[in-house]
Curated annotation (Swiss-Prot):
Site feature Interaction with substrate tRNA, where: 104
Protein name (Swiss-Prot/TrEMBL): tRNA dimethylallyltransferase
Domain of life: Bacteria
Lineage: Bacteria, Bacillati, Cyanobacteriota, Cyanophyceae, Synechococcales
Catalysis performed (reactions): adenosine(37) in tRNA + dimethylallyl diphosphate = N(6)-dimethylallyladenosine(37) in tRNA + diphosphate
Keywords noted in UniProt: ATP-binding, Magnesium, Nucleotide-binding, Transferase, tRNA processing
InterPro entries: Dimethylallyltransferase, IPT, P-loop_NTPase
Chain positions covered by the region annotation Interaction with substrate tRNA: 38-41
Quaternary structure, from the entry: Monomer.
Annotated function: Catalyzes the transfer of a dimethylallyl group onto the adenine at position 37 in tRNAs that read codons beginning with uridine, leading to the formation of N6-(dimethylallyl)adenosine (i(6)A).
Source species of the chain: Prochlorococcus marinus (strain MIT 9301)
Pfam families xref list: IPPT (PF01715)
Chain sites annotated for binding ATP: 13-20
Length: 299
């Protein structure tokens, strides 16, 4: 293995921008694998609602960090950071070109920038109390103790809201005060994918999710883990659950899911521009542009 810092390629972008399809084409060209950096695709049985790469796509190119835990067992950033770094180091040992793809800015930067992540174990009693308060009250608490985190976490994301409160109450420090601890000794190229027609893509993908069976997938998760499974607060699953309990129609669920996803995508784009500043790819031919940039980086 070379004594020089290993090269690592990163592809980031908002949800529904087409990262999965482009990443597979890039991986095929450079004969490498994909490390999926996503806070929801790590869970089993959550395929449709997380837009997980299909079985066919996963057969075409090997994807790491998918389906590594049951939805009942939340994985925090610290745990994901450790699992991902170990997997990436294994690729480097094999002289493979690590290729990281995802839209979860915090998870990605915990790996590429070496963010220090508080090693706070789950506080079951505290979590129970917070669960009883409900998401709206928990959000109010988070706005008071860690307002910066509320700009990075989706209002409906009960899991991450409780985790941020948990870190604050245990350490006395806001989760948003994470600092760079020790960036890995990698030479990193960050590419960004952002589509001009993102709203239309989100609406179309949302319709496809409901046509493809997110309601059945949600029903399966409920039957296996219970109606109050925290991860079901994820955009799309929450709306599908509301259809199942007759609190919403399918049309309303599609509209609300798309609206929330558009809002989430805006926050992702803001994060990437402020925290990452990648080389944004040409929308007309992102594959050609990516290949040119990567080959130049590797030469």
């Amino acid at each position: 293995m070379s004594s020089h810092p290993p090269h690592v390629i990163v592809l980031i972008g908002p949800t529904a921008s087409g990262k999965t399809e482009l990443a597979i084409e890039i991986a095929e060209y450079f004969k490498t694998n994909i490390h999926n950096i996503d806070s929801r695709q790590i869970y089993k049985s959550m395929d449709i609602g997380t837009a997980k790469p299909s079985k066919i796509q996963q057969k075409k190119i090997r994807h790491f960090l998918i389906d590594i835990e049951e939805p009942i067992n939340p994985i925090n950033v610290k745990q994901f950071q450790e699992i991902a770094q170990k997997s990436i180091k294994e690729e480097i040992k094999k002289d493979k070109l690590p290729f990281l793809v995802g839209g979860s800015g915090l998870y990605m930067n915990s790996i590429t920038k070496g963010f220090f992540v508080p090693d706070v174990p789950p506080q079951n009693n505290l979590r129970k109390q917070l669960e009883e308060l409900g998401q709206e009250k928990c959000w109010d608490l988070l706005e008071n103790c860690d307002p910066l985190s509320t700009k990075k976490i989706n209002f409906a994301d009960h899991v991450r809201t409780i985790r941020a409160l948990e870190v604050f109450y245990v350490t006395g420090k806001p989760l948003s005060t994470l600092k760079v601890q020790k960036p890995p000794n990698w030479k990193i190229l960050e590419l960004g994918l952002d589509r001009g027609n993102l709203k239309e893509r989100i609406f179309q993908r949302t319709k496809n999710m409901f046509l493809s069976g997110i309601i059945d997938e949600t029903n399966h998760l409920i039957s296996k883990y219970g109606f109050d499974l925290p991860i079901l607060e994820t955009i799309g699953y929450r709306e599908a659950r509301n259809v199942l309990n007759n609190h919403s129609t399918i049309d309303k669920a599609i509209e609300l899911t798309a609206t929330k996803t558009i809002q989430f995508a805006k926050r992702q784009k803001t994060w990437f521009r402020n925290k990452n500043n990648p080389l944004w790819l040409n929308n007309k031919n992102p594959l050609k542009d990516a290949i040119i940039k990567i080959e130049s980086f590797l030469s």
